[in-house]
């Protein structure tokens, strides 16, 4: 669990912002959301495969040449 030390004379809002940044970097919230409900191993594999296919299509679209307009 990430934590921060509040510095002397540091505003509360700044400390909260630093804490949120460390939480975001470590990925605690995304893991918490994924573990909120049980997901069957087959459903997890299916979701990961669909995400990989989507990433692949996105990568291929960016590599394609633009159509000629003349």
Swiss-Prot record:
InterPro entries: Ribosomal_bS21 (IPR001911), Ribosomal_bS21_CS (IPR018278), Ribosomal_bS21_sf (IPR038380). Belongs to the bacterial ribosomal protein bS21 family. This is Small ribosomal subunit protein bS21. PROSITE patterns: RIBOSOMAL_S21. Keywords: Ribonucleoprotein, Ribosomal protein. Disulfide bonds: none annotated. One of its GO terms (biological process) is translation. It holds the Pfam family Ribosomal_S21. NCBIfam families: S21p. The keyword Ribosomal protein applies. The gene is rpsU. GO terms for cellular component: ribonucleoprotein complex; ribosome. GO terms for molecular function: structural constituent of ribosome. The lineage of its organism: Bacteria, Pseudomonadati, Pseudomonadota, Betaproteobacteria, Rhodocyclales.
């Amino acid at each position: 669990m990430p934590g921060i030390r509040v510095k002397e004379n540091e505003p509360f809002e700044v400390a909260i912002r630093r804490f949120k940044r460390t939480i975001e970097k470590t990925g605690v919230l995304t893991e918490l959301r994924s573990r909120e409900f049980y997901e069957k191993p087959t459903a997890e594999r299916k979701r990961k495969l669909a995400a990989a296919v989507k990433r692949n299509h996105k990568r291929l679209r960016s590599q394609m040449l633009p159509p000629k307009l003349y």
